[in-house]
């Protein structure tokens, strides 16, 4: 009888622990595929960006919902920029500084398929002139299905990670096709 109660208590504890929300993990937000390396070779930003700041993320409360922290997003962004050959080799020599703000992480409260929408502002500032040469808000979404995980809390984390990864991928795709152009002290994007 005592053994059965101990087993039941252990199972209950495991069930409660598995129901706790976990934060988005940076390694699952890193863009590793789909980068147009040929376009990167011709990009004005090749090997020239350093991440200055990432703000707007939230820490996960284990008793509530999974969130994307600023630190996890920054780690994923740095690794993704490195994979895309956009990250400067030395921070102090980087001609461009990247400032990022997570403006919105829109999450559903419940559902079988959970879609998370992220909206992130990316600003690239030229180091020497302190001029903004790129400033865009980029939206992205990702849907995690019941097939990805039967647990809603885990599906939400997967949707967070996928949306953040898609957002970083959209930024990289956009920035490798843009060239900063200085003319008379004004900055224009071509």
Predicted segments with their positions:
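Extracytoplasmic/periplasmic, Sec-exported soluble proteins
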Residues: 65, 69, 73, 114-116, ...
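Surface-exposed short loop/turn segments
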Residues: 21-30, 84-135, 139-158
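A structural "domain/chain start" motif
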Residues: 20-75, 176-190
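Extracytoplasmic/secreted envelope proteins and their assembly/folding machinery
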Residues: 70, 74, 78-81, 165-168, ...
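A generic structural signal for short, solvent-exposed coil/turn residues
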Residues: 9-12, 41-43, 90-92, 130
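Sec-dependent bacterial lipoprotein signal peptides
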Residues: 1-20
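Compositionally biased, intrinsically disordered linkers/stalks adjacent to structured regions
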Residues: 151-190
